[in-house]
Curated annotation (Swiss-Prot):
Belongs to the bacterial ribosomal protein bL33 family. The keyword Ribosomal protein applies. Pfam families: Ribosomal_L33 (PF00471). The lineage of its organism: Bacteria, Bacillati, Bacillota, Clostridia, Moorellales. GO terms for cellular component: cytoplasm; ribonucleoprotein complex; ribosome. Keywords: Ribonucleoprotein, Ribosomal protein. It comes from Moorella thermoacetica (strain ATCC 39073 / JCM 9320). It comes from the Bacteria. This is Large ribosomal subunit protein bL33.
Length: 49
């Protein structure tokens, strides 16, 4: 079952990306390194509700 998730920047706390994940394969919260247009650089983005 795929569910929608939001990815938030860990530095500025803004929610920049919307994605989906498979809860069966990834039960934990996802952390990805993505570009934050507000910070102007690549930062770690964590899954939020």
């Amino acid at each position: 079952m795929r569910v929608g998730i939001t990815l938030a920047c860990t530095e500025c706390k803004r929610r920049n990306y919307i994605s989906t994940k498979n809860k069966k394969n990834d039960p934990d919260r996802i952390e990805l390194k993505k570009y934050c247009s507000f910070c102007g650089r690549h930062t770690v983005h964590k899954e939020t509700k």
